[in-house]
Amino acid sequence: MNITNVRIRRVDNKDSSSKLLAYVTVTFDDCLVLHNIRVIRGQKGVFIVMPNRRTKIGEYKDIVHPINQSFREILQSAIFKEYVKENPSNFELELV
């Protein structure tokens, strides 16, 4: 499965303490689209959060997620590459 498109929707944070940097939509093989991946700045660096839902007991469960580390790295790399391309001076890439 190949990533054929990555679209970044930056979040303009007026509050500098906000951790959310962007929402991402990824297209696979021009036939499957995954919406609402989030780019988050945490204490240890920047990472992606897959689309999730809050359960009745308050836990968050991923709706969809990579099942192995190598694909997660491919996905994260494609997202960060596009983010940096669109925001070269606004992003210090320190991955978690």
From Swiss-Prot:
Keyword Coiled coil set for record: no
Top-level taxon in the UniProt lineage: Bacteria
GO terms of biological process kind: division septum assembly; sporulation resulting in formation of a cellular spore
Keyword Cell cycle applies: yes
Function: Could be involved in septation.
Family affiliation: Belongs to the SpoVG family.
Protein name: Putative septation protein SpoVG
Lineage: Bacteria, Pseudomonadati, Spirochaetota, Spirochaetia, Spirochaetales
